[in-house]
Amino acid sequence: MTTDTPPPKPGLTYAEAGVDIDAGNTLVDRIKPAAKATSRPGVMSGLGGFGALFDLRAAGYADPVLVAATDGVGTKLRIAIDTGHVDTIGIDLVAMCVNDLVCQGAEPLLFLDYFATGKLDVAEAATIVEGIARGCATSGCALIGGETAEMPGMYAKGDFDLAGFAVGAMERGGALPANVAAGDMILGLASDGVHSNGYSLVRRIVERSGLGWGDPAPFEGRTLGAALLTPTRLYVQPALAAIRAGGVHGLAHVTGGGLTENLPRVLPEGLGIEINLGAWELPPVFRWLAAEGGLDEAELLKTFNAGIGMALIVAPDRAEALADLLAGAGERVAVIGHVTEGAGAVHYRGTLL
């Protein structure tokens, strides 16, 4: 009695497993011009190597200290994915990293991104990376490398995730915060909307409202999705100009935790902050979120930027000149408070709502 030998199973390929290396190579070729456009003094290599090279001396530094920051965009990505509007989400990614760097007194020099998805859509990924490149160019930092990860089975169809990593530098002795003292004034720079924090609550409020992303926003003329995808403002160049002008003792990027949690991060022991909530107008998007979500003022101030995206703590005798400098650079500036004697908390005077 003979036993039939089963035919051999056909060989598998990586592409059949769901990973298209050719698509990845196509993406790299497509984004090279955008990355090249961000080049700056110090860049020694382009995309495609095993690592990226940067020459700090060529960038003008004599005795540099490096500063690194990494971040993502959070669940704002969900709105970008659901609406298909992904052209500015890369700007958010850059802003979340480089705005943090400048708070340490550092000039952003280079940026790397991580893009992960279940199935690579070259056109979509290129649009996202081109947004990253625009953010880098605005901030004066080079998009020097990155990683595109196509991972079948790890993400739902159409979903993706982003992470960014930025490196900056300052000359030794230039780190901030420094010399923060009672009586220092706080300059608030206006935000361009919700920026990139609090979106889990935003999405819950939108769900409660019964509105869709394509419906008109109740607080402005665009669709709700477009309004909520307004990219995070990049404060790097105006903030660096203020630092170089002298008198800046500290900066706080107002992200998750709002003014309530972020301002104390730049305070030494024994000092507090008083904020005058009447110093600026609460933007309509936050007024709508508060009303629709039933948020009290404390929740609003601890979750969202509430209209102030960056705060600078400055010497009192430099406040007016620095406010003029920042306004001349295109920022909307308000004197929103001052540093006080006391233990590390933020105290609010007046009301926003």
Curated annotation (Swiss-Prot):
Coiled coil: none annotated. InterPro entries: PurM-like_C_dom, PurM-like_C_sf, PurM-like_N, PurM-like_N_sf, PurM_cligase. SUPFAM superfamilies: PurM C-terminal domain-like (SSF56042), PurM N-terminal domain-like (SSF55326). Pathway: Purine metabolism; IMP biosynthesis via de novo pathway; 5-amino-1-(5-phospho-D-ribosyl)imidazole from N(2)-formyl-N(1)-(5-phospho-D-ribosyl)glycinamide: step 2/2. GO terms for molecular function: ATP binding; phosphoribosylamine-glycine ligase activity; phosphoribosylformylglycinamidine cyclo-ligase activity. Gene3D superfamilies: PurM-like C-terminal domain, PurM-like, N-terminal domain. It comes from the Bacteria. GO terms for cellular component: cytosol. NCBIfam families: purM. Belongs to the AIR synthase family. This is Phosphoribosylformylglycinamidine cyclo-ligase. It comes from Dinoroseobacter shibae (strain DSM 16493 / NCIMB 14021 / DFL 12). The gene is purM.
